Amino acid sequence: MRALRSTRLIALIGCGLAVVLVGCGKKDAAFEIITPPVPAVLPKHWNVPEFALTERTGGTVILADFSGKVWVADFFYTTCPGPCPMMSSRLSEVQKQLGTEPNLRLVSISIDPEKDTPDVLKLYAEKFQATDRWLFLTGPKAGIYALARDGFKLPIAEPETPGGQIIHSTRLILIDRLGAIRGFYEATNETGVNDLIRDIRKLLKEK
């Protein structure tokens, strides 16, 4: 009788253990992190519209100057106390890794052109050791705001209070050789700049 009870007890323990193991297996599967695959070909969004702005050197830059080039754009201003220095640091990292690529350009467009004159932009560019392949642009405020909102579809707004911060996007935008936007990357996220560098390399290989 005791032997029978012992056998039943062992069987029950075995079943319980089996249930626990199966349950754990299901739980692990439920919490498994699945990383979405990186697309082999980057999607094409829309084309950047025509523009004409002034570079820190005093020269005029137009959209056609980027024909045949892969370029990365951002909208910033030199007195920004918030994310702009980080955005510029991210582009500096791109320059560090890919700055020798002859068909790559970095383009920082000021959204405070009244203060960000070419001379001011020149001093700012020096802080980040920007080469001549990293352009800093300024120009008419209305045109720049329209370019940000309508051309790149990025939010931008005047300060809510006098002397306040200009509200703007912290995204970096990747544009291909034909002027088509191919991706947006969050500059405040380290993963964003890593993804950007990866995708720049993809576009540089595109014919």
Indicate residue ranges for each PLM-predicted region.
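N-terminal "domain-start" segment that seeds a small globular fold
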Residues: 29-64, 89
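Short, internal strand/loop/helix patches
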Residues: 122-169
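Thiol-based oxidoreductase modules, predominantly thioredoxin-like and allied folds used
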Residues: 103-116, 132-142
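Short active-site neighborhood of thiol/selenol oxidoreductases, capturing the structured segment around
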Residues: 63-85, 90-91
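C-terminal motif of bacterial Sec signal peptides marking the signal peptidase cleavage site
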Residues: 20-23
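Thiol-/selenol-based redox modules, centered on thioredoxin-like
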Residues: 160-207
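Bacterial N-terminal signal peptides that target proteins for export
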Residues: 1-13
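Conserved helix-turn-beta segment immediately C-terminal to the redox Cys motif
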Residues: 69-70, 86-109, 126-127
